[in-house]
Amino acid sequence: MKYSDLRDFISQLQQMGELKRINMPVSPYLEMTEICDRTLRAEGPALLFENPTGHTIPVLGNLFGTPQRVALGMGATDVSELRKIGHVLAMLKEPEPPKGFKDMLGLGSLVKSLWDMTPKERRDAPCHDIVWEGNDVDLARLPIQHCWPGDIAPLITWGLVITKGPHKKRQNLGIYRQQVIGRNKVIMRWLAQRGGALDFREHSIANRGQPYPIAVALGADPATILGAVTPVPDSLSEYQFAGLLRGSRTELVKAIGSELRVPASAEIVLEGHIYPDESHPSGYEHALEGPYGDHTGYYNEQDTFPVFTIDRITMRRDPIYHSTYTGKPPDEPAILGVALNEVFIPLLQKQFSEILDFYLPPEGCSYRMAVVQMKKAYPGHAKRVMFGVWSFLRQFMYTKFIIVVDEDVNIRDWKEVIWAITTRVDPTRDTTLVDNTPIDYLDFASPVSGLGSKMGIDATNKWPGETDREWGTTITMTPEVKKRVDQIWQELGI
């Protein structure tokens, strides 16, 4: 299914019984978090809070609270179809010469589809229906959630941050949380390795002393939102990929105060700059961010990040504010990880044909632990796969633990994974520790902020060269006996 904008998606979710409208007044301060958390854990619907306490703008929560709704947002009808998207991305990342006429036609069709999905720029747009400028710019007028009791301030969570580096042809889309610190100021928390931070760093070197323009889109269409969290090849625009998911070109409009292009159908757009401040070593305004409850289930440490000053807020008529919360798994990021896991698999298999399956357990905070099922071919093969996964996609840079198992182990069943670890692993021989690697800043378990270690666990059967002992043989029943018992099972009355 395809959706022209967020409102179209909401309408179709409601028809499918996947969205619940809440008419009762509910406060953005803590109450929405508790309601959304209970609903997500029950695999319930998306929630549209129509009367947030103290505000007239409705709040949309739990939008991607089930893998099925993530799949719907990506234009699929079921989670199983997401692997097709992964196959497309794998081909775009590393295209192969066509093996025959049929392959050539297929490749040509995909290239044409991508060309046809070049974003379309409009002269006017719904997101410019209403414009707040000057003293009218006041974030307190938006129903921004205060998610947890220990959070320092309200937090913008689902903002699609749009940036552009001075030497890049295309814009970057990323989702970074933003702490409200004033009527027109937020702290832009982006890690140094993320696209937005890299764009800003390039600007601060090339154009030091010049304000850095940013736009933040709230309530874009689902394909554009999900395109921003998908491992799109660097050569492909997230807007272009969103068009491919949607089946129609992404419509953009020029921001009023900069050259950035924003989604024309976005519900709300924040426009502004990171302004110079020579009192900070970077030459730009910074502030201390946090603490906030995050996807680890803990409150994180404070750290310093750039301040984004909002010069204007534009919006559609009767806008909808899209929000979420992060907390101990499962939360929305964990659910997104479950769905995007299916997109990752073809990408990994394209690079490492020995990988049969790949799983990011949601309990592992979306990406901190990965389990890999492989077809082992030689001694030490599992270690090659570990380092391959760590280095292949940016998404796995922060994966702390990788467990590798053989093809006879179902990696989505923890009972089988634990059985493999406890019967096939010698802790000294089969664990690989790597020091001083990039780690999520939110991971307070690391000895240094942003830098820590990783562990690989080889839970495969060991081959000659890996052990001098005779390796155990797995116990299995004969096929003949299984078939016989299948035939008489009903008669046994068990």
Swiss-Prot record:
Q: Which residues bind prenylated FMN?
A: 175-177, 189-191, 194-195
Q: Does the entry feature the keyword Lyase, yes or no?
A: yes
GO cellular component terms listed in the entry, alphabetical order: cytosol; plasma membrane
Q: Name one GO biological process term.
A: ubiquinone biosynthetic process
**Top-rank lineage group of the source organism:** Bacteria
The record's EC number reads 4.1.1.98
Per UniProt, Mn(2+) binds at: 172, 238
UniProt membrane topology term: Peripheral membrane protein
- Which lineage? Bacteria, Pseudomonadati, Pseudomonadota, Betaproteobacteria, Burkholderiales
Question: What organism is listed for this UniProt entry?
Answer: Herminiimonas arsenicoxydans
List the active-site residues.
Answer: 294
What's the family?
Belongs to the UbiD family.
Tell where it localizes: Cell membrane
How is the cofactor bound, in the record's words? Binds 1 prenylated FMN per subunit.
Pfam families from the entry? UbiD (PF01977), UbiD_C (PF20696), UbiD_N (PF20695)
Its recorded name reads 3-octaprenyl-4-hydroxybenzoate carboxy-lyase
Q: In which pathway does it act?
A: Cofactor biosynthesis; ubiquinone biosynthesis
Where mainly located? membrane
Q: Which SUPFAM superfamilies does the record cross-reference, listed alphabetically? A: FMN-binding split barrel, UbiD C-terminal domain-like
Keywords recorded for this protein, A-Z: Cell membrane, Decarboxylase, Flavoprotein, FMN, Lyase, Manganese, Membrane, Metal-binding, Ubiquinone biosynthesis
Reaction(s) catalysed by this chain, per the record, are: a 4-hydroxy-3-(all-trans-polyprenyl)benzoate + H(+) = a 2-(all-trans-polyprenyl)phenol + CO2
Q: Which gene encodes it?
A: ubiD
Q: What does this protein do?
A: Catalyzes the decarboxylation of 3-octaprenyl-4-hydroxy benzoate to 2-octaprenylphenol, an intermediate step in ubiquinone biosynthesis.
